[in-house]
């Protein structure tokens, strides 16, 4: 019985009018047709939606039995078997002019099978699908959206991502995850190849640097920029090892990864040790084919290989946000410095000078780093400065200060670029002979986003 509600009739008429306008553009498969009405109705695929609308149009034409309805059947015929039966026309559905066959079930199956093959040997449980459209497909879709005038469509790539994702999940047992995928499956429709982007692993921990003479991270040769030259012995590096490189090997092997990227909470000088509880860091593991790592075993292996040089502890899995947190968190740091004076100083005078250091210090960029740091004045606080050992020409002190304060220049004054300085207060030259970082604080446990 026809609806007595004029609004219902108007909506149905508007839907069929839009559908006819789309069909007049050329033969269109059920998926591409249904996708133009994707926001209407739930619990069905676009293919089912498109097939249902085509069936509704055939039934509507049967009811009307008019020239207009026969014209609608002719528009349907190239892509609807029921319309061809009504018209008495033989043949099969013509190729879809919009997707050029990319939305056909067998094509989606093929893409899913390729993805599952590419995922073999990669340890993961969560994935996301992303589609790269060819230029022609993008142009066809743009024409359809412009001329079809449907207000209820969704993009073709969204449907491909969803439908191929369902098939991958069914075939592999892995789960789609829009927010935190371990791999991203890239479908390249121009040539049909499938590429797997493995998301990084992030491991938080602390390191202790037990020897002097090497940097925190890989340092390209200043002369050749890393290409290799006489100065660096054709290694491309200023130093032959670093904290980064020392711990890299065991991590790359354990995760079957391509590389690592090291993110530290600041860095100590090359000639300084990092002692105490260690410095917070995050290692970004690049393209790990294994993710289920035993971090206790990894810690032990790193410490075994780096024995006497570097030691790591407190390894946990974290998410990407920890990189920014570790790099940007401002920690108070405690240093132990062995100082040498140009002339003997009195112990009480030294203690007095140390107490007067407490407070704010104005530091212009030190001469030794001016080639790689902006030339500006920084204001940092010294929270404590205490004498630990004293022998006239040498002293050992501990200094607790803000992150970013240059302790060597706090002692020497750097020709007046740091004020006040210990040398200025003593009216005597002073320099740091040995420097150790003995505490860096750390990211509060409440801020650490652990990944189980």
UniProtKB/Swiss-Prot annotation:
Substrate binds at residues 335, 406. Gene3D superfamilies: 3.30.70.2510, 3.30.70.3190. It catalyses: uridine(54) in tRNA = pseudouridine(54) in tRNA; uridine(55) in tRNA = pseudouridine(55) in tRNA. Keywords: Isomerase, RNA-binding, tRNA processing. One of its GO terms (biological process) is tRNA pseudouridine synthesis. Residues 71-200 form the THUMP domain. The active site is at 269 (nucleophile). Its EC number is 5.4.99.25. Responsible for synthesis of pseudouridine from uracil-54 and uracil-55 in the psi GC loop of transfer RNAs. The keyword tRNA processing applies. It comes from the Archaea. PROSITE patterns: THUMP (PS51165). Belongs to the pseudouridine synthase Pus10 family. InterPro entries: PsdUridine_synth_cat_dom_sf, Pus10, Pus10-like, Pus10-like_C, Pus10_THUMP_arc, THUMP_dom. Pfam families: Pus10_C, Pus10_THUMP_arc. This is tRNA pseudouridine synthase Pus10.
């Amino acid at each position: 019985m026809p609806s007595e509600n004029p609004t219902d009739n108007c909506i149905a008429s508007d839907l069929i009018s839009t559908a006819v306008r789309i069909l007049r553009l050329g033969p269109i498969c059920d998926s591409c047709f249904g996708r133009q009405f994707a926001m209407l109705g739930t619990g069905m695929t676009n293919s089912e939606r498109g097939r249902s609308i085509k069936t509704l149009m055939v039934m509507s034409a049967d009811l009307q039995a008019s020239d207009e309805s026969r014209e609608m059947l002719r528009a349907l015929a190239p892509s609807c078997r029921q319309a061809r039966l009504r018209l008495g026309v033989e043949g099969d559905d013509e190729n879809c002019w919009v997707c050029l066959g990319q939305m056909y079930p067998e094509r989606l199956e093929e893409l899913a099978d390729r993805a599952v093959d590419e995922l073999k040997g990669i340890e993961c449980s969560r994935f996301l699908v992303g589609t790269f459209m060819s230029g022609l497909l993008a142009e066809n879709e743009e024409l359809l959206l412009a001329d079809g005038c449907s207000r209820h469509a969704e993009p073709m790539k969204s449907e491909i991502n969803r439908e191929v994702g369902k098939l991958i999940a069914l075939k592999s047992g892995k789960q789609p995850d829009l927010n935190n995928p371990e791999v991203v499956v890239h479908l390249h429709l121009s040539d049909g190849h499938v590429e797997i982007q493995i998301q990084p692993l992030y491991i938080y921990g602390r390191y202790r640097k037990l020897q002097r003479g090497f940097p925190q991270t890989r340092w390209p040769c200043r002369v050749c920029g890393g290409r290799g030259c006489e100065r660096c012995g054709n290694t491309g590096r200023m130093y032959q090892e670093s904290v980064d490189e020392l711990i890299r090997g065991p991590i790359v092997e354990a995760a079957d990864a391509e590389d690592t990227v090291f993110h530290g909470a600041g860095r100590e000088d090359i000639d300084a040790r990092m002692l105490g509880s260690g410095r917070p860091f995050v290692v970004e593991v690049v393209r790990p084919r294994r993710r289920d790592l035993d971090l206790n075993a990894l810690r032990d292996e790193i410490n075994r290989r780096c024995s006497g040089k570097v030691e790591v502890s407190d390894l946990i899995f974290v998410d990407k946000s920890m990189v920014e947190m570790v790099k940007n968190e401002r920690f108070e740091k405690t240093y132990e410095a062995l100082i040498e004076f140009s002339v003997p100083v009195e112990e009480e005078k030294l203690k007095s000078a140390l107490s007067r250091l407490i407070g704010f210090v104005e530091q212009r960029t030190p001469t030794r780093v001016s080639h790689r740091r902006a030339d500006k004045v920084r204001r940092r606080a010294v929270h404590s400065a205490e004498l630990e050992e004293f022998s006239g020409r040498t002293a050992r002190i501990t200094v607790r200060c803000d992150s970013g304060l240059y302790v060597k220049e706090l002692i020497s004054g750097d020709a007046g670029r740091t004020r006040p300085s210990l040398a200025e207060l003593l009216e005597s030259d002073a320099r740091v002979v040995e420097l150790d970082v003995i505490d860096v604080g750390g990211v509060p446990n409440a801020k650490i986003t652990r990944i189980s």
